[in-house]
Amino acid sequence: TRISHRIFATSRSEMGSNMNYKIYLDYTMDILSHLKISCHIIDSPFIWNEQYDGGLRKTIWNDAAHRSQMNDFNRFVSTYSKDNTILIIHDSFCCEYIYLKLPDSDKIFIAGPFSFEKFTNQRITELCTYNSIPARFNEFMQLYYAALPVFTDERCIESIINTLCSK
């Protein structure tokens, strides 16, 4: 699995005492949804669901490859499931995901996909080649990237998430 990540430790360890963060989490999810970033609260252990990436992987991979990749991703995320830690996950499709284990809980917040780069036709072709995506999926990939929220300034998303974690 080709995944990179950055880890941000939250600035205040009291974020989750007695679920006081719920109002801030709801507010953050509302902001992100207005930015067209899908958000989910799920129970751990983390198990990939095709809705998290808009069906991208399920569409382009056969069932065996899809299962294998999802198992690898689940193991990766479970390794970093720690309180007071935010993961910004960058996958091989140049999609970003925000992952945060909610404190005092077995629940996980995940948001994405979105990107920090604009996608040209050439860039999409490069990503398809890099990920060994058959040519028959070119139109699907063009539509997928056209619909993906793009933020050319990473500080926008990082500020939203860091503000959540400071509460």
Summary of predicted features, one role per range:
Residues 47-61:
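Amphipathic coiled-coil signal-relay and dimerization helices
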Residues 11-38, 42-45, 63-167:
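Hydrophobic, helix-rich cores of sensory/ligand-binding and other regulatory modules
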